[in-house]
Every structure is written in structure tokens, then in C-alpha cells.
Amino acid sequence: MTPHQRGDRREASRGVGRRAMDALYGIIRWAGGHVRGFHAAVGLYLTIGFGLALLGLGLFAALARLVGGGALHAADTRVLLWLHQHTSPVGDALALAGAALGSGTALWIALLGGSLYLARSRHFYSLALLWVALLGGRMLDRVLKLTFERPRPRLFGSEIELLGWQVEYPQSYSFPSGHALTSMVIYGTLAYLVARTEPTRRMRRWTLAGAALLILGIGLSRLYLAVHYPSDVLAGYLAGFAWATFSAYGIEAVRYFRGRRPAVALAEADLGAGMSPVREALREEPT
């Protein structure tokens, strides 16, 4: 493939992403033009949120069924073998960095830093969301691992050496990936909380894109280290997305029913005239 062809493919991929975002905002604008009344608008917002959570849960259930039936084992193994054949010092360094950023220590640092900021700025509902997402995500990871009891891949012995570091294989079950699930929950929730306070759509996109790259890198590091199958990582992403989305919109529902002023994570410019009853609710305020 020539450089020109690769450039065309990258441009086409970006075009697909832009069209998807434009379609999403088009749906929001259409809803804004047709939904009347504060309660109906907020109800639609919550319905969309819980619908996204159910979508993630449904995809996870479908993937779990394939894994349980052994349909993905051969493909999972081929991916790990291919990665093992294409290791490099740069790849080793990136894998170790990804493993460190997805470790419990890094996640707790991010959690405590975010908690301190939210507490000092008096965003208590956002603080509650962060902790609900973490505690529920950790519990969900343990329950799912014990439910499926999928053994870890053991393709290259009990440990692997990268840049002089001995990386031992975890002893817990493999499905889903805890690193993928908890990074999606913590970094995804933090990105959501930061992005909804950004003044422009471009800044929100950069914030969410940065979090997405970080979460993706953590998941890829688990494959590079061969401590998870690809389906484990994908399952972790889906379960983490479902739980983080459910938590976020659940907290918004509690906030609405207690204060009748939800912090809707949409920009005012993204809404049509029909959503005017909730325009004042779109600004993050101390609660």
C-alpha cells in the first residue's frame, strides 16, 4: 500500500467519525425541535443515557456467549502469537507504561486527585458519581470474573521479561479484563466530568479523545503482555462503558429529582429551540 493510499484511508476513517458525530448532534437537534416541556426533555435525556448503558450490556452479553462457547479462542490465540512475534524495545516500553497507567496505584491517584478537585469546587454530585463508578466497577469486575472463571492465557510461561523487568502473570481469572474495565470507568468518568465543563465542543472532543487513547493504550498493553485475550479486553471495555454510563445518568436522575436542575452534559448550542426549558440547567453549578 502506497503512502498516498494510506493517507486516503486515514482521511476516510476521520470522515466516518465526523459523520457519526454530526449524525448524533443532528438527532439531538431534532429532539430539541420536537420535545416540549422541561420534564419531557429531561426524560428524553435520561432515556438516551440508560439506552446507551443497555446497549453496552447487550453487546457484553453477546460477547460472553461467544467466549463461553469457545468460538473466539482460536482467534484470540492468533492475535497474542502475532503480537509476541512483533515485540520491540519501543513496544516493551509502551506496554509497561500502559500497565502502570492502568494499575491500581495510578487509578487511585487519578481518583483522589479528581475527588479533591470536585470537593473543593463543591461539585458533590460529580464527586458521588466518581466514587459510585469506582466502587461499582470494582465489584462488577470481581463478580464477572467469578461468574465466567476463564483461565488466563499461558502461552509463554508464567512470566515475561521486558526491558529487564520481570512481569508475572496475574493469578485471577481472565474474563473480563480488570484493567480495561476499571480504566474505562475511572478515566472515562473523569473525562466526562471534565468535558461537560469545557466551553467549546472542540475542547470537549479533545478531552474525550485523549481519554479514549489512554484507555485504548491500557487495553493494548494487556494483549502485548499476553495476560489477557483480546475478547477479555473488549469485554472489559463494554462492561465498563455500561456501568459508567448507567452511573452517570443515574446520578443525574437523583440530582434532578432532588434539586430539579440536572447538569445535562450537552452544550446549549447543540440544542434546538424546543429544549429552551432546560437551557439554564446546562451549566455545571456547585451542588
Describe every region a protein language model picked out.
Residues 45-51, 114-140, 208:
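Interfacial segments of alpha-helical transmembrane regions
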Residues 52-57, 137-141, 218, 243-248:
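Alpha-helical transmembrane segments of multipass membrane proteins
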Residues 158-285:
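Membrane-embedded catalytic cores of phosphoryl/pyrophosphoryl-handling enzymes
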Residues 1-109, 146-148, 152-167, 286:
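N-terminal transmembrane-helix/juxtamembrane module of multi-pass inner/ER membrane proteins
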Residues 125-156, 213-230:
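Hydrophobic alpha-helical transmembrane segments of integral membrane proteins
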